[in-house]
């Protein structure tokens, strides 16, 4: 009986694994914001994803960071395409909620997607009067 259960569990896991891998890889874009002044994640920050178009920027998606300062799946439910994109972090609202001034009402970070089968992570290290970003993993 135990052997049958073990075999059934292994078979079930083997068929489930590709689905889990696909689910983990299907969203190609994530962001993470850390407040450098407090050393803590920046929760509840609105972030917008936009694609460069001939006449400006086309909004694709908007979400808010979770309690860990993350948006794990910012790419909308559509097929990824190569091109120029930007994420816009609405940092002014974040600091305003804390009764703090900020020099940057929003921080746009432009980047290029040249491989749609890769994951793109955009971390933002934030303070009231400065920021830093890079391509994360």
Swiss-Prot record:
Taxon lineage: Bacteria, Pseudomonadati, Pseudomonadota, Gammaproteobacteria, Enterobacterales
Organism: Escherichia coli O157:H7
UniProt protein name: 5-hydroxyisourate hydrolase
Quaternary structure note: Homotetramer.
Gene3D superfamilies documented for this protein: Transthyretin/hydroxyisourate hydrolase domain (2.60.40.180)
EC code: 3.5.2.17
Similarity remark: Belongs to the transthyretin family. 5-hydroxyisourate hydrolase subfamily.
Localization, UniProt: Periplasm
Signal sequence, start to end: 1-23
Leading EC class: hydrolase
Binding site for substrate: 32, 70, 134
GO CC, one annotated term: periplasmic space
